[in-house]
């Protein structure tokens, strides 16, 4: 049973926000009030449906004492009682604390791991997979930085994904992705294992954290062409080092000014994510064990091409739909990860 007094508090807060917005809140307050209003609206819809179901059940049970209405009540009561547990579960999920970063754009970083050129090719496959998934969701996918490898893979890629639920959905992708397949360069037909690392960070704004100029060192470098060929090189590439943490970010687009913007954007995202991780660890000693903790060293998934199989090791989910997944159809696996994370957080909240 969900505590009714807590539900009434939420409804009263929602009504207060609605009245403030209707009356014309101060311009400085409108954004914060509108954001809270939008977050509470789906919760209030669930509360309204739940309260209506409880009232309908109470009315039907009262009809049992009326001989003329008893038969009708006996028909309605089982269905009403059967609906309520599902509505309570939906309410519990709606009442879970929201991750403030879920509504933000996502910064996606992909790097090859062990496996040489095959790992670089797989990293490129992952980049295309996420781009197709983003396009299928109607999100904007912007490639911020790309360092290609000699055979058409990538040495490093950074992208920005913007759209409703972008970070909320993509945050489960952080970790080590392992691939098992026969490389195109393998003459003997042997299966090789290689890996790529994915990091998904919530985009941070300048107001989220201040980075003193004394804390960073900016270096300009000569940027190289595709495949490492130093053709048409310029001094536009930028490397920014955050001295307190040792974090280094680079950008090698054609415009040096744009490179500084991109590098600072990625640096802010990494520092913001670092602080989020610190706070999450402080809140819960078990957080590292939960899906979505963002541990970049955790092997989260295996893509087995000969078997057409993808296995997510965090939730023991295996899908024999690898071609569709690599083509960007990630909805089933991400939905399963979301449900698992919600269940873990519910258990933690109710413990």
Swiss-Prot record:
NADP keyword on record: no
Entry coiled-coil feature ranges: none
Entries under Pfam families matching the protein: PCRF (PF03462), RF-1 (PF00472)
Residue numbers bearing the N5-methylglutamine modification: 229
GO cellular component: cytoplasm
Predominant localisation class: cytoplasm
Post-translational modification: Methylated by PrmC. Methylation increases the termination efficiency of RF1.
SMART domains: PCRF
InterPro entries: PCRF, Pep_chain_release_fac_I, Pep_chain_release_fac_I_sf, Prokaryotic/Mito_RF, RF-1
Cellular localisation: Cytoplasm
Keywords per UniProt: Cytoplasm, Methylation, Protein biosynthesis
GO molecular-function term, one example from the UniProt record: translation release factor activity, codon specific
Signal peptide: none
Function in brief: Peptide chain release factor 1 directs the termination of translation in response to the peptide chain termination codons UAG and UAA.
Similarity field: Belongs to the prokaryotic/mitochondrial release factor family.
Name of this chain's protein: Peptide chain release factor 1
Annotated source species: Cereibacter sphaeroides (strain ATCC 17023 / DSM 158 / JCM 6121 / CCUG 31486 / LMG 2827 / NBRC 12203 / NCIMB 8253 / ATH 2.4.1.) (Rhodobacter sphaeroides)
Taxon lineage: Bacteria, Pseudomonadati, Pseudomonadota, Alphaproteobacteria, Rhodobacterales
């Amino acid at each position: 049973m969900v505590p009714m007094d807590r539900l009434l508090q939420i409804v009263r807060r929602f009504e207060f926000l609605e009245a403030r917005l209707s009356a014309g809140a101060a311009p400085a307050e409108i954004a914060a009030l509108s954001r809270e209003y939008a977050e509470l609206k789906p919760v209030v819809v669930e509360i309204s449906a739940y309260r209506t179901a409880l009232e309908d059940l109470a009315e039907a049970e009262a009809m049992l004492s009326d001989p003329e209405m008893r038969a009708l009540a006996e028909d309605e009561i089982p269905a009403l009682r059967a609906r309520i547990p599902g509505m309570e579960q939906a309410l519990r999920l709606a009442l879970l604390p929201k991750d403030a970063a879920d509504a933000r754009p996502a910064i996606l970083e992909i790097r090859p791991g062990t496996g040489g050129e095959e790992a670089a090719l797989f990293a490129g496959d992952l980049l295309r997979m996420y781009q197709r998934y983003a396009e299928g969701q109607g999100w904007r996918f912007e490639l911020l930085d790309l360092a290609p490898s000699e055979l058409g893979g990538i040495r490093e890629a950074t992208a920005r994904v913007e759209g409703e639920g972008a970070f909320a959905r993509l945050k489960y992708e952080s970790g080590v992705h392992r691939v098992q397949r026969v490389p195109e360069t393998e003459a003997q037909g042997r299966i090789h294992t290689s890996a790529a690392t994915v990091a998904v960070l919530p985009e941070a704004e300048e107001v989220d954290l201040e980075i003193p100029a004394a804390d960073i060192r900016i270096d300009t470098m000569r940027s190289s062409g595709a495949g490492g060929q130093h053709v048409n090189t310029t001094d536009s590439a930028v490397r920014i080092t955050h001295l307190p943490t040792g974090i280094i970010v680079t950008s090698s687009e054609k415009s040096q000014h744009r490179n500084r913007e991109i590098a600072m954007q990625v640096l802010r995202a990494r520092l913001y994510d670092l602080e989020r991780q610190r706070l999450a660890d402080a809140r819960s000693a078990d957080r590292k064990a939960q899906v979505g903790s963002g541990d970049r060293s955790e092997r989260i998934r295996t893509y087995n091409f000969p078997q057409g199989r993808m296995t997510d090791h965090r939730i023991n989910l295996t899908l024999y739909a690898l071609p569709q997944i690599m083509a960007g159809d990630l909805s089933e696996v991400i939905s399963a990860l979301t449900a698992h994370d919600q269940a873990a957080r519910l258990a933690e909240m109710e413990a």
